[in-house]
Amino acid sequence: MRADEYAFFEPPFIAFAHRGGAMYSPNLGRENSLQAFAEAVALGYRYLETDVHATADGVLIAFHDSKLDRVTDRRGAIAKLTYEEVSRAKIHGIDDIPRFEDLLTSFPDARFNVDAKSAGSVDLLSDLIIAHGAQDRVCVNSFGIRRLHRLRKRLGSKVASGASGLAIAVYRFAPQLTKIINTRAPVLQIPMEQKILGVRLRVLTPALVQAAH
């Protein structure tokens, strides 16, 4: 399917606010916080990017890393902590870690591009999307191909999803094959370049762009 066949892409967009606009100066150090997302929305962003992890007791939180250490005032692996324990941590020593559900309810007009970072997050994410009727507001993705396949299976074909790493490799190295191989994704989420075995490889090429369109 093409991207324009998904309701997710109906509002025109220029850019995503990555982790809630983490590089915008008022948000520095406050990535994936409600405050960061609110700043992005106030700037006019309709599309927001985030990541999700599951706590030990099955609460889905918007957080990039598997551990609290880098951006909060506490330490520990999220998958081994209860939500009560995680909720004591403050992003940049200031902000609460939001649940993904909090993002859906706090920003009802926003679209979310969500990366399921752990196996435990997949069913929780799909359940929340369905419970909130947010199928048109969310695009799901995961670097783990099994996680991505399970998301697609549980959410169905009407929910937009990103291409797998294998599909991206086909677009990059054998774009002619995309005419006969169904990548099952309307979205290619790629870096400009990627470092592989110490060598910087250009990912975004004219041939890839042409194949994607």
Where are these regions (language model features)?
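Phosphate-group recognition and catalysis centered on beta-loop-alpha active-site segments
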Residues: 1-213
